[in-house]
Amino acid sequence: MFLTAVLLRGRIPGRQWIGKHRRPRTVSFQAKESMIRRLEVEAENHYWLSMPYMTAEQECGHAAERRAQAFEAIKAAATSKFPKHRYIADQLDHLNISKKWS
């Protein structure tokens, strides 16, 4: 039993690249460099986003007119797909040739 434990000591059970007891992957130089580059980009984004271009008072309602125009354009595009209204008076207007009975 002790001999079996000694001989099978370093074995990864099951599939060696997936699972709970998997073999750890070595970190390459390229992976380190790409991670550093990604963290630098994230830090720069955080820096620029931490300083807003407009104050909260300026930002409040600055795009209301543009948003209203965009909504009107969307509404007009949606209503243009529908056919025009049809009225019964227009449909039966050809029957009003003569009104001798009235």
From Swiss-Prot:
This is Large ribosomal subunit protein mL63. InterPro entries: Ribosomal_mL63. Belongs to the mitochondrion-specific ribosomal protein mL63 family. Its main location: mitochondrion. It comes from the Eukaryota. GO terms for molecular function: structural constituent of ribosome. Keywords: Mitochondrion, Ribonucleoprotein, Ribosomal protein. Coiled coil: none annotated. It is found in: Mitochondrion. The lineage of its organism: Eukaryota, Metazoa, Chordata, Craniata, Vertebrata. GO terms for biological process: mitochondrial translation; translation. The keyword Ribonucleoprotein applies. One of its GO terms (cellular component) is mitochondrial inner membrane. Identified only in the intact 55S subunit. It is unknown whether it belongs to the 28S or to the 39S subunit. May localize at the subunit interface and dissociate from the 55S mitoribosome during subunit separation. It comes from Mus musculus.
